[in-house]
A protein has these predicted regions:
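Bacterial N-terminal signal peptides
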Residues: 10-20
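Catalytic alpha/beta core domains of metabolic enzymes, predominantly
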Residues: 171-292
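C-terminal alpha-helical cap/extension of soluble enzyme domains
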Residues: 36-41, 64, 237-239, 248-363
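Bacterial Sec-dependent signal peptides at the C-terminal "C-region" and cleavage site
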Residues: 18-28
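Short helix-capping segments at alpha-helix termini
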Residues: 95-102, 128-131, 162-164, 189-193, ...
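Active-site beta->alpha loop and helix N-cap motifs at the rims of alpha/beta catalytic domains
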Residues: 28-176
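Buried hydrophobic positions in well-ordered alpha/beta secondary-structure cores of metabolic enzymes
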Residues: 46, 60, 92, 158, ...
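Bacterial N-terminal signal peptides that target proteins for export
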Residues: 1-12
Length: 363
């Protein structure tokens, strides 16, 4: 069959549009709702427990979360080797490629330097192609970024490398705060990469910055709450954040329940009670050890109770001069019968807001 010059031009244009659509398809799929960071599971012999990590991601997906993020940022640079990072993400990507997995698999993409973070981004590109899966990145500034120019330079370099949406995390505890104007400028320069922001500035700045970012739509597509969802009720209802990025995977179904009530204007008037139950579970860390910002400690028991984790172990660096020159040691979370009874009682109170059929007290 012969085509006229006009027909050939039309076919080429259509093919070009198709390629562009394929490249930007991930960006067009909304990223919103709860994005829990997965709690990293360990084996008794100090290895990353990859099957349990996948099981945790499956739980987050069943709960209806918008995404699942792994591995935990603090553990990436502190405890997790690059090989473990790769193996964990590879297994998660393979699972996320199956049709029943709707949550957006999101890879934490930190780095001591910009180069290290870009290495992680290239790995994600590789895994997306290998498994034919759409992913996203959660990217904070590199640890050695000492001024805004360095932060912006890193994100521009990442914008050239990343082949999926990037959620900018605005705070890493080390670098200065990036301006809202520069975040918006990046979203306009790289519209298929940027425009999603986890805003968690320190102190009293966060709510005002969120309002500025929400006002910058459509360049800014989604503003997520952070800081453990502790300000999410106000930020979601009054400012307009459209989800939360937080280390709260044991309570993914509770996060989804809260999110749906924020979305529908609290049609059944249960939002305040559900949110209070989330804070009730956070308080376990303050009461039984670990603090309210960590999902280890007593929350590992919750993951056990819900049939996700098999132990309550955490891998930590062995002290200098340790016997046999071992690099790691495993720390357990001992809980008395009284402490377990307290956790069980609180889970029972939260049960009306948890996903039916999931393992919890008296299921």
């Amino acid at each position: 069959m012969r085509f006229s010059k006009t027909m050939r031009f039309s076919i080429c244009a259509a093919l070009a549009l198709g390629v562009a659509a394929a490249c930007s398809g991930a960006a067009e799929r909304p990223l919103r709702g709860p994005f829990p960071l997965l709690v990293t599971p360990w084996t008794e012999d100090a290895k990353l427990d990859v099957p349990t990590l996948v099981k945790e991601a499956e739980f987050v997906n069943r709960c209806g979360a918008g995404g699942g993020i792994g591995p935990s940022a603090a553990e990436v640079l502190g405890n997790l080797s690059m090989d473990e990072y790769r193996r964990g993400l590879d297994a998660l990507a393979a699972r996320a490629a199956r049709p029943d997995f709707k949550a957006r698999l999101t890879a934490v993409c930190p780095g001591r330097s910009s180069a290290e973070a870009l290495t992680r981004a290239r790995l994600v590109n590789e895994l997306q192609k290998k498994h034919n899966v759409e992913m996203a990145l959660l990217a904070r500034p590199p640890d050695n970024a000492t001024n805004e120019a360095a932060i912006v330079a890193h994100y521009r370099a990442l914008g050239e490398v990343a082949e999926c949406p990037v959620i900018i995390q605005t705070y890493n505890g080390k670098s200065p705060q990036q301006s809202v104007a520069s975040i918006v400028a990046l979203a306009k320069e790289f519209p298929h990469v940027y425009g999603w922001v986890k805003e968690e500035s320190p102190g009293g700045l966060v709510n005002g910055r969120m309002a500025e970012l929400v006002a910058a739509k459509p360049a800014i597509k989604t503003v997520f709450s952070g800081w453990g969802a502790k300000g999410w009720l106000y930020q979601g209802r009054r400012i307009g954040t459209e989800g939360v990025v937080t280390q709260r995977a044991p309570y993914a179904d509770l996060l989804v329940y809260i999110w749906r009530r924020i979305e529908n204007g609290d049609a059944d008037h249960t939002l305040l009670d559900a949110y209070s139950k989330l804070l009730l579970m956070y308080n376990l860390g303050d009461t039984l050890g670990g603090g309210s910002d960590s999902m280890r400690g007593p929350h590992l028991y919750v993951l056990q109770k819900r049939g996700i984790f098999t132990n309550r172990l955490t891998r930590v660096h062995a002290p200098k001069g340790a016997k046999n020159g071992k690099k790691w040691e495993m720390k357990d979370v001992p809980l008395s019968d009284l402490e377990k009874a307290e956790i069980d009682s609180r889970l029972e109170a939260v049960k009306p807001y948890l996903l039916k059929g999931e393992i919890c007290p008296r299921d």
